[in-house]
């Protein structure tokens, strides 16, 4: 089973598999965020973090490769009265635009292999404006065993 099939299968359930509240670590960064600007939510899944960033006043691009997750992300944004652009692409191969975002966020980076992380983080760094903020949270790959 491919990674796409695995994630699409997980996200194709009616429930939000990670819930609808933002990641705790991300929410704890609220006072550090700019009051306006553009944010990129990488591997945003069902949109809980992208929606929260939009609620903070940021213009959000939510990036994920699962169509089922993106349908739920759009529903969650609508339910919360915010808008965000939803882009379907593999986060490891997306053509990250240069210096386009004030904030770049990736939560749960452990789902990418070390080689994939290098590709993704290179793109994320490219997409970050000078002086911008990058927020990354993850665990070791061993965490996936639990």
Regions found by a protein language model. Give the residues of each.
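A short acidic, Gly/Pro-enriched loop at the edge of an enzyme's catalytic core
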Residues: 92-103
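Conserved beta-strand signature within the Rossmann-like core of class I S-adenosyl-L-methionine
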Residues: 131-139
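A short, conserved alpha-helix within the catalytic core of class I
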Residues: 111-124
């Amino acid at each position: 089973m491919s990674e796409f099939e695995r994630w699409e299968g997980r996200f194709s359930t009616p429930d939000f598999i990670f819930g609808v509240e933002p990641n705790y670590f991300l929410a704890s960064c609220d006072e550090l965020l700019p009051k306006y600007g553009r944010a990129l939510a990488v591997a945003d899944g069902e949109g809980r973090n992208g929606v929260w960033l939009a609620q903070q006043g940021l213009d959000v691009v939510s990036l994920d490769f699962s169509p089922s997750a993106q349908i739920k992300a759009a529903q969650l944004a609508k339910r919360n009265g915010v808008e965000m652009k939803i882009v379907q692409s593999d986060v490891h191969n997306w053509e990250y635009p240069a210096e386009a975002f004030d904030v770049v966020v990736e939560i749960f980076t452990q789902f990418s292999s070390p080689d994939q992380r290098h590709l993704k983080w290179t793109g994320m760094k490219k997409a970050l404006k000078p002086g911008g903020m990058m927020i990354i949270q993850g665990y070791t790959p061993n965490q996936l065993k639990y």
